[in-house]
Regions:
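N-terminal signal peptide c-region/cleavage motif recognized by signal peptidases
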Residues: 13-17
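Alpha-carbonic anhydrase
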Residues: 3-4, 18-244
Length: 244
């Protein structure tokens, strides 16, 4: 029973596994990103929103902002193939202190190729670490992967990817979240949205400046499980300020 409750709580906090699942959306055909805003009234922001994600990060304003204050704690993890991405739900204790508020990591998932771009450069893989505060507000830390040496924490995750859609598995070997991140945590900050329906806005985005590596084999393994690209196209900036 506790395991089922954990799954339910984590799915309720997910980008991809939300009320949006009641309407078919995806990345191909009539359900692709160009059609999201017309699939349901709940998805209207996908078409009409003015602060949508992802974006091309360029001409960022250099300004002093607080360094990322992250804390990590080992605990229960579950890995899900929900048909839109591979997602890892995590237990409590992984926190981000931002704007004098504490955000708790709910899950992290991946997009290939990357959704955000940096100075017009698209990366082969992007990870999103989804944090939520006590009021339900979300902050996303985005991590870029470039092709290079194999990534050991990523290998741990990929070895446990469920092959079937909607398959949920307990993570046998925990994924070292902190080890996924680069040594330098310099970041770009802007206000954006969910990159999947319902495209809700008011999300604090923190895109890490420095990528980490993943091997070509690891990138291809993710793509072969997804069977399609799972990135939303770049959205207009509409005058938003990007802080670096």
């Amino acid at each position: 029973m506790k395991g089922k409750l954990f799954i339910a709580l984590m799915l309720s906090a997910s980008f991809s596994a939300s009320a949006a699942d009641s309407v078919h959306w995806g990345y191909e055909g009539d359900g692709d990103p160009a059609h999201w805003g017309k699939l349901s009234p709940d998805f209207s922001l996908c078409e009409t929103g003015k602060n949508q994600s992802p974006i091309n990060i360029r001409q960022a304003l250099n300004a002093q902002h607080d360094p990322l204050q992250l804390a990590f704690q080992s605990g229960t993890q579950q890995i899900i193939n929900n048909g839109h991405t591979i997602q890892v739900n995590v237990g409590p204790g992984n926190t981000l202190l931002l704007d004098n508020e504490t955000f708790t990591l709910q899950q992290f998932h991946f997009h290939a190729p990357s959704e955000n771009e940096i100075d017009g450069k698209q990366f082969p893989l992007e990870g999103h670490f989804v944090y939520k505060n006590a009021d339900g507000a979300l902050t996303v830390i985005a991590l870029m992967f470039q092709e290079g040496a194999a990534n050991l924490p990523l290998a741990t995750a990929w070895q446990q990817i469920p092959a079937r859609v909607d398959q949920v598995e307990d993570v046998r070997t925990p994924i070292a979240i902190q080890a996924l991140l680069p040594t330098s945590l310099n970041y770009y900050r802007f206000s954006g949205s969910l990159t999947t329906p319902p495209c809700s806005e008011g999300i604090r985005w923190l895109v890490l400046e420095n990528p980490v590596t993943a091997s070509a084999e690891q990138i291809n393994q993710f793509s072969s499980v997804m069977h399609h690209a799972n990135n939303r196209p770049i959205q207009p900036l509409n005058g938003r300020i990007i802080i670096h």
